[in-house]
């Protein structure tokens, strides 16, 4: 009742301001209408992702956002386990004005922390309405609760995959020395690492080179250790589950065909010295430091997971020690569907809490970020500084481009370009604005412009223009009707959450044990792992989650 009453008062006041006023025009400029207010205001914000480059909106983009909206964010970003911090926020009753909880939205909804944004969007957010169009139905929370609690910011609208930022990574120098061989299977990938280490066991300073390292620090274990078992066996990224495309039934992916063999390969890499012995004990900063040292030949990660380490290499001019992305599968019998289209996933995003003193100002702020002006500002920066317009086309000047490539951390902190992507709704790659320019810089010509000489040399050897050319095209696969199940929220009081935590703990313990075991011990550990999953109730969890997948399909497609 507290939430409803507070919202009603604010909405009534806002509607009274609108009385007798017209909308003015059909323009999508964000600061239109009689309730536009750009007086200085600070909104508190919590984000479940870390953000090392956050500069308190004192970057160029942030200052312009404040100029246009009057809003400054007093932001806190997660530095450790965001789930624990969000649980504390939910229990406290003291919420930030804006919150981006990622997969823990259910905790806040159950606590009554979140405002239903449906009427706010309808009355005050023309750009958000325009952006999502007929896909706005996907913003609904569930079949039972059609409220809109967040503006999706982690999933772009109408985009296509131009960027291959995942797969298996290899240093350019290693691939070059191997003669640019075909790299399609785990064996191909292993061969490049092995041959390079045999010739170069140490770096120029006598430090031992590392064949491959993994990041098993907390949730990173899913990205670099466990998810690849599904991806290399043709089960596109659905988090901890494999979804049968014919029945929409969920199976904990560790119980599916081929995954034992993947972890057996990791065990082989560990026991032959090609996998870093510290992979399962190092922290994230130690992982990044190894990448930055240039001694790690191979990675299995998303580019955002190791980019800070790679940026240090670029800043030092060591471009041949940075990484290319390869479509690697367990064997030739599998087809890589890592980039199978999810369609618009909705899901994770930014919401307004019941603690917000002025929800209208908050939604207008989010509406500006979703506007054409706001998106261009975030993606490109300031005209005349981070880009120019030549013959009607946005162009990044050469000196700016060099900073983006070789001094990216400092450039991002100063410019703010890209820092606000996960705070505002946005179009995806390949979508053009009203001037005929692409919203994002991720279109083929600009992607190529962003590549280092080492990347261009490697790609040329493979007769490819971009890394995506080395992967099967998303058009080869149907769009997944459930999107991606890792962004399906399960109510916090559902028993499957308890089971999911149990099987997660088992997996995070048993998989490293299996990888680090002696080869002759692997089968026994694997069999014990599978039995422990059953004992923990994994089958009940699968059945329960299947219902949520099928509900998602119904919610989105009927």
Predicted regions span which residues?
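Short acidic loop-to-helix transition motifs that present clustered carboxylates
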Residues: 79-84, 282-285, 331-333
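Conserved N-terminal structural module of periplasmic/extracytoplasmic solute-binding proteins
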Residues: 6-10, 21-188, 200, 233-242, ...
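Helix-loop-helix "hinge/cap" segment bordering the ligand-binding cleft or interdomain interface
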Residues: 147, 152-222, 244-290, 295, ...
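Polar, glycine-rich mid-to-C-terminal structural blocks
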Residues: 321-331, 338-420
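Carboxylate/His-rich catalytic cores and anion/metal-binding grooves
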Residues: 105-106, 112-140, 193-197, 207-243, ...
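Conserved small-residue motifs centered on glycine
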Residues: 377-509, 516
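C-terminal motif of bacterial Sec signal peptides marking the signal peptidase cleavage site
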Residues: 16-20
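General small-molecule cofactor/ligand-binding pocket signal
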Residues: 72-78, 278, 324-327
